Structure formats: structure tokens, C-alpha cells
Amino acid sequence: PNLAWQGSGYVDCNAGTVPLESTFSGWHWTRTDPINGESWIFYNRESVSGAKEGLTLRYTDGGGLQRGIALDDGPPVKPTPIWRCARPVARTSGPSRIIKTLEDTPFYARSKMAVEHAGEQYTAMHEYVDLKRFSRPWVQRLLPFRMPRRARE
């Protein structure tokens, strides 16, 4: 197909033999926009057993990749305005704040954020998935219906 886009983007997928909520209770990640050819990804997940695991990746100009020290969760930012979905964030070297809520559903939030890390102020994309909430019967009953999205700029 003839596809093209402008701006930042990413591709992700989930694959496995069991439903995600059988293994994970949730996860959140933050991906910074590049500054001087450097971008960060902070990824934290929690298994249904309560075990937590994190990953920090630093991408550099020219395709370099370095694995960093996993960051614990920092103070959460404000929950989403409609469904009150939590938005935990990794404990970077400075405060994080919401710039704009892009997706606000009962179990999922996507937000544009301001993040301070390693002495730089980054604009970042943040995602949080709450699979405990996803598994609740009231949320399951809502799944056939599309959740409203905010208008794109």
C-alpha cells in the first residue's frame, strides 16, 4: 500500500497464547521525542502475581541502543478526566506532567506528557493499561462500543 506520515510514530504489537490479563495486571510506558538525536523509553509492568519489572532504553542518533537502569514508579500524574483511569509514570530525574489526554477509556489512557530526564525537558507519549480494570464485568460489557477519541489537531 501507498502509506506515508509526518511526525513521530511507533509500531507495537502484543502476541501470545493466553489473554494479556492472564499474565499482567497492567503496564505503562513513556517514549520521549528525540532531542539532539537521543530518545528514551521507560517501560514498567506488573504481573498478576504482583511482581514488578522495568526497562529503560536510550536510543541515540544513528541507531545506537543502550539499556539503562530500570526506574521504579514515581508519583502518579492526574487520572484521566472522564473515566478516572490512573496514569502511573516512571520515576525520571524530574517531574512529569500531562500536556494533553489523547485516549481516555475505562482501562486505557494515552497522553502527551512533559518529562524531565538526564537534564533535558522532553515531550513524550505515555500509555497506561489497567488489565485488572479491563477484566471487570462492567468494562467487559462496554467493549463492543467504541470509546470516544479526542479530535486530532
Predicted regions and their residues:
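Structured soluble/peripheral alpha/beta segments that form catalytic or ligand/cofactor-binding pockets
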Residues: 1-153
